Amino acid sequence: MPMKVAEVLELLAADGWYRSRTRGSHRQYRHPTKHGTVTVAGKPADTLHPKTLTSILRQAGLKDPR
């Protein structure tokens, strides 16, 4: 089942990611100890494509909670 952008943002925040910058609907997140950035695009009510969700979770080093 696809996830909403808001649910992904909650997962990132729970793991310690913080928003570093925004341009339009693209939010970029950084982590104090993990390397790299994670970009999440779309409005909070939008549904993410399954491959986009997989990519975001892989970049963040998280497992799919479902």
Each model region followed by its residue ranges:
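Active-site beta-strand termini and strand-to-loop segments that position acidic
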Residues: 29-33
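C-terminal structural segments of small proteins and small subunits
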Residues: 35-37, 41-66
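Secondary-structure boundary/capping motif
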Residues: 4, 21, 48-49
